Amino acid sequence: MAQSTLYSRVLGTGSYLPPDRVTNQQLTDRLAKEGIETSDEWIVARTGIHARHFAAPDVTTSDLALEASRRAIEAAGVDPQSIDLIIVATSTPDFVFPSTACLLQNKLGIKNGGAAFDVQAVCSGFAYAMATADSFIRSGQHRTALIVGAETFSRILDFKDRTTCVLFGDGAGAVILSASEEPGVLGSALHADGSYSNILCTPGNVNRGVIDGSVFLHMDGQAVFKLAVNVLEKVAIEALAKANLAPEQIDWLIPHQANIRIMTSTCRKLGLPQERMVVTVDQHGNTSAASIPLALDAAVRDGRIQRGQHVLIEGVGGGFTWGASVFRF
């Protein structure tokens, strides 16, 4: 008897934003006390961001991941003990090691000895994690994966640099991906170019347990913008080709929620109407690896994304890294 082809498909989604919502005006007032000038109008015009969420000092990335994971598990209707693969995409882990994924596995009470590890591709992290989990499931090594993007970027922001501190926020999003004979993930593409590592980085490093250098995020905004708009269209087309789909067959585009100008540029280049693009950056800012699953969960829960529809996710981030995946929800 011929063995059936194995696919992976999305069973459920979840997300979590910490309760401390900081509006542009609140952030502007905070910065003004430090002698730094900005305004709600300046931030919105350049980024489309109106607010972001910051985690409390005693809340870690794994805590945010836990809340999002619980919601995804509930939505998927799976037994947590059936999850035999956990991948957390993050650039702000709780510790140097162990991985945030291992900490999350323990917090969820999963005792089955399944694999758990982190992926670090900054804002492309969720695209990398989803493609990785899909490959593991298709190979037959694992059956049910929990994929999480979670960040506490507020911990690495320099609040004396108005060009970066207004952009980022904290949050987490999660997806349950499970083995299926029915096609789900249809195509993925991942890329990196380390020669651009200096345009978006946190240059501090761990040396014998002590952080040397700056622990704050540094970004060349113009260079990032130029590179992002160039690679995002290409990687989207590549993923679509692997899925045997044309851009017009995509029901929903979920780009990394970084900057509304980058997002709309990519949407326009793909020939998609703006109404098919999911936008949540206005409400939570750039949450790095968490942004794509946050937006995905929002659109699933408000009824925009329906079963059977084609979804294209794409991200670009420090490294420089970029990636995209196409799936049938």
UniProtKB/Swiss-Prot annotation:
GO terms for biological process: fatty acid biosynthetic process; secondary metabolite biosynthetic process. Its EC number is 2.3.1.180. It is an enzyme of class 2 (transferase). It holds the Pfam family ACP_syn_III. Its main location: cytoplasm. Keywords: Acyltransferase, Cytoplasm, Fatty acid biosynthesis, Fatty acid metabolism, Lipid biosynthesis, Lipid metabolism, Multifunctional enzyme, Transferase. GO terms for molecular function: 3-oxoacyl-[acyl-carrier-protein] synthase activity; beta-ketoacyl-acyl-carrier-protein synthase III activity. Residues 257-261 are annotated as: ACP-binding. One of its GO terms (cellular component) is cytoplasm. It is found in: Cytoplasm. The active site is at 123, 256, 286. It comes from the Bacteria. SUPFAM superfamilies: Thiolase-like (SSF53901). Pathway: Lipid metabolism; fatty acid biosynthesis. InterPro entries: ACP_syn_III_C, ACP_syn_III_N, FabH, Thiolase-like. It catalyses: malonyl-[ACP] + acetyl-CoA + H(+) = 3-oxobutanoyl-[ACP] + CO2 + CoA. The last Arg residue of the ACP-binding site is essential for the weak association between ACP/AcpP and FabH. Catalyzes the condensation reaction of fatty acid synthesis by the addition to an acyl acceptor of two carbons from malonyl-ACP. Catalyzes the first condensation reaction which initiates fatty acid synthesis and may therefore play a role in governing the total rate of fatty acid production. Possesses both acetoacetyl-ACP synthase and acetyl transacylase activities. Its substrate specificity determines the biosynthesis of branched-chain and/or straight-chain of fatty acids. Homodimer. NCBIfam families: fabH (TIGR00747), PRK09352.1 (NF006829). Belongs to the thiolase-like superfamily. FabH family. This is Beta-ketoacyl-[acyl-carrier-protein] synthase III. The gene is fabH.
